[in-house]
């Protein structure tokens, strides 16, 4: 019976990912709520209440995006899971809204988990955790927090996350993925490089002023692209060349020189967000899902992550891009990949989300 329920749940989730971005399932009530932040300030929180709850709870942590908990793809995913009777929470993590990859993100992540464990009905109930992209990195890091070691989540799943920031950035330079000697070429999305420069350019000395570049990056991470473009037009000299290298992913000598400065002078911060340096200490059962067509983080990052974790389940699928389902597949390939997804999600539902 549990096998049938898990397969049905997986099918509902896949159906939701294709249909729930622009429509709400009638079996799920959505609520804009709030929770007390680190300083007890009201912090936005989206809650998805199934009409027929099965008692399972999932916290879905967003990636680095100005849209945060309101990101359409996050909401689609939450709906697609909640239709199976699972109560889903998407908390705002304020530093991620500002695209600041600081250690405070971990504090907020653990803080919300602790707060949720104090809420009526959740005090003694197991909670499942999920993280998207950079949110996945922080969920993994949170598993090593003393509170989560004492009261661990029932299951952990990460989507499109990275293993080593440095190797992820190498993919951004050239779009090359070397998988078992096979070279795969993709056109990278510059978002990860934009976020990296947004975080570290103001912390290093590159030999000339970069205030203009920093202002452009601030506008870009806030999705203010028109204002950013206008400011780019006003830049001159080294700053103009640098911002074009960043947004066009030109692997110039100057671009590589500055990246080298980041990895040298900001090493501690970068290691903090690179599971390579600490994931071996994670004992939780972790489900890892990554798309072969992901242009933000290469799928080989998840393969490396899986090899270092002691208790993990991995699926690399051609049907997924970073946050969406791919339409660039033959019907036969799509059916084959769909069956793999159903098998993987069924195992995940049995391991955490089904009572």
Question: What are these language model-derived features?
Answer:
Residues 270-271, 295-301:
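Conserved alpha/beta-hydrolase "acid-adjacent" motif
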Residues 325-355:
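Catalytic active-site module of serine/aspartate enzymes centered on a nucleophile-bearing elbow/loop
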Residues 70-77, 92-128, 138, 143-146:
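Catalytic nucleophile-loop/oxyanion-hole region of alpha/beta-hydrolase
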Residues 144-237:
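Alpha/beta-hydrolase-fold enzymes
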Residues 309-325:
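Catalytic histidine neighborhood in serine/cysteine hydrolases
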Residues 49-84, 90-93:
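Short, surface-exposed "cap/lid" segments of acyl-processing enzymes
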Residues 282, 288-290, 294:
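Short beta-strand/loop motif that positions the catalytic acidic residue
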Residues 3-56:
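N-terminal cap/lid segment of alpha/beta-hydrolase-fold proteins
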């Amino acid at each position: 019976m549990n096998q049938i329920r898990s397969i049905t749940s997986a099918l509902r989730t896949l159906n939701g990912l294709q249909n729930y971005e622009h429509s709400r399932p009638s079996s799920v009530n959505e609520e804009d709520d709030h929770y007390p932040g680190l300083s007890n300030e009201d912090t936005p929180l989206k809650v998805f209440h199934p009409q027929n709850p099965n008692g399972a709870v999932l916290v879905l942590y967003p990636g680095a995006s100005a849209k945060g908990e309101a990101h359409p793809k996050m909401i689609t995913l939450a709906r697609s899971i909640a239709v199976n009777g699972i109560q889903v929470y998407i908390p705002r993590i304020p530093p991620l809204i500002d695209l600041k990859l600081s250690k405070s993100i971990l504090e907020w992540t653990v803080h919300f988990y602790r707060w949720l464990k104090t809420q009526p009905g959740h005090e003694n109930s197991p909670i499942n955790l999920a993280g998207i992209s950079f949110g996945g990195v922080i969920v993994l890091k949170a598993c090593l927090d003393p509170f989560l070691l004492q009261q661990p989540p029932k299951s952990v799943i990460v989507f499109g996350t990275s293993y080593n920031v440095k190797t992820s950035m190498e993919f951004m330079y050239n779009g090359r993925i070397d998988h078992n000697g096979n070279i795969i070429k993709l056109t990278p999305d510059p978002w990860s490089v934009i976020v990296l420069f947004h975080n570290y350019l103001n912390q290093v000395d590159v030999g000339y002023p970069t205030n203009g570049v920093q202002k452009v990056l601030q506008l870009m991470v806030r999705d203010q692209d028109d204002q950013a473009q206008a400011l780019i037009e006003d830049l001159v000299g080294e700053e103009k060349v640098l911002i074009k290298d960043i947004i066009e992913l030109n692997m110039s000598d100057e671009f590589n020189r500055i990246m080298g400065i980041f990895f040298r002078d900001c090493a501690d911060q970068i290691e903090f967000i690179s599971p390579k340096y600490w994931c071996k200490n994670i004992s939780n059962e972790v489900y890892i899902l990554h798309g072969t067509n992901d242009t933000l983080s290469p799928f080989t990052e998840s393969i490396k992550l899986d090899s270092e974790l002691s208790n993990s389940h991995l699926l690399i699928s051609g049907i997924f891009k970073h946050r969406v389902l791919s339409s660039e597949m033959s019907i036969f390939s799509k059916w084959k990949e769909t069956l793999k997804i159903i098998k993987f999600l069924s195992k995940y539902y049995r391991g955490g989300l089904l009572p």
